[in-house]
């Protein structure tokens, strides 16, 4: 995988994490699809890991 693709993937992961955070901050009753909670939690975790990766990656350059 080329570095540019990896960077793009990481940025998309961060965006997914942001969406996940918005989803998880809405009250449980108001959520459009309760089965998405698991995936949204996963996307938040992935987003945080992606942010850490991007910060470490750009320090080296």
Swiss-Prot record:
It is a multi-pass membrane protein. The keyword Transmembrane applies. The chain crosses the membrane at residues 5-25, 35-55. Signal peptide: none annotated. It is found in: Membrane. Keywords: Membrane, Transmembrane, Transmembrane helix. It comes from the Viruses. GO terms for cellular component: membrane. This is Transmembrane protein 300R.
